Curated annotation (Swiss-Prot):
Disulfide bonds join 25-38, 29-34. This is Gomesin. The modification Pyrrolidone carboxylic acid is found at residue 24. Its main location: secreted. Keywords: Amidation, Antibiotic, Antimicrobial, Cleavage on pair of basic residues, Cytolysis, Disulfide bond, Fungicide, Hemolysis, Immunity, Innate immunity, Pyrrolidone carboxylic acid, Secreted, Signal. GO terms for cellular component: extracellular region. Residues 1-23 form the signal peptide. GO terms for biological process: defense response to bacterium; defense response to fungus; innate immune response; killing of cells of another organism. The modification Arginine amide is found at residue 41. It comes from Acanthoscurria gomesiana. Residues 42-84 form a propeptide. The lineage of its organism: Eukaryota, Metazoa, Ecdysozoa, Arthropoda, Chelicerata. It comes from the Eukaryota.
Length: 84
């Protein structure tokens, strides 16, 4: 019984790691600010570039205020965002 439970836990851990490694990342840029969002993960990284310098600040933030896919398409149609 313990072997079965151990095997099930190991299998679940492997599946979670595979899912995390297959996350699809997308980079959105607008006016010297870029956001990299990886689906399958709960965080984004925000890159801010100061005008005239090459310093880039990166920080992680919660994606609770992230636009939905429909909103992203609307923004893409307006030409506001550049997808790399």
């Amino acid at each position: 019984m313990n072997r079965t439970r151990l095997f099930a836990c190991l299998l679940l851990a492997v599946l979670i790691l595979v899912h995390e490694s297959n996350a699809q990342c997308r980079r959105l840029c607008y006016k010297q600010r870029c956001v990299t969002y990886c689906r399958g993960r709960g965080k984004r990284s925000l890159d801010e570039t100061n005008v005239g310098t090459s310093d880039v600040e990166k920080r992680a933030f919660d994606d609770s205020n992230v636009p939905s896919l429909v909103e992203e398409r609307e923004l893409e149609d307006e030409g506001s965002f550049i997808f790399d």
